[in-house]
Swiss-Prot record:
InterPro entries named among the record's database cross-references: UPF0060
Annotated TM spans: 5-25, 31-51, 60-80, 86-106
Cellular compartments per GO CC: plasma membrane
Record membrane topology: Multi-pass membrane protein
Listed name of the protein: UPF0060 membrane protein SH0717
Record localization: Cell membrane
The UniProt record lists the keyword Ligase: no
Keywords, comma-separated and alphabetical: Cell membrane, Membrane, Transmembrane, Transmembrane helix
Principal location class: membrane
Source species of the chain: Staphylococcus haemolyticus (strain JCSC1435)
Protein family per UniProt: Belongs to the UPF0060 family.
Taxonomy, superkingdom: Bacteria
Length: 108
């Protein structure tokens, strides 16, 4: 279980970080090198997600989606200095509950 959490967190950092670098390039007019580096990091995200131990693509990405939402809010708070409001927090909690429902039960 700790391995799965680690992979989710690493994938999230790559997806959010890579996307953020592309955002800086295209939306804020920063260097195209940031866009290139962001693209490479996003490719790493695609590879890292395959290290999950879950047997199916759909379940991995569905569960990861909830983790991505929470990590995006944390990123917004730390990097963009934008605190989540109560609706953001309620929505994130609902997502994490959904992730737990998907990944915690043992399946045969």
């Amino acid at each position: 279980m700790l391995y799965s959490i680690f992979i989710f967190l690493l994938a999230g950092l790559c997806e959010i970080g890579g996307g953020y670098l592309i955002w800086l390039w295209l939306r804020e007019g920063q260097s195209s090198w940031l866009g290139f580096i962001g693209g490479v990091i996003l490719m790493m995200y695609g590879v890292i997600a395959t290290f999950q131990s879950f047997p199916t693509f759909g379940r991995v990405y569905a569960a990861y989606g909830g983790v991505f939402i929470v990590m995006s809010l944390i990123w917004a708070y730390i990097v963009d200095k934008q605190a989540p409001d109560k609706y953001d927090l309620i929505g994130a909690c609902i997502c994490i509950i959904g992730v737990c429902v998907m990944i915690l039960p043992s399946r045969t």
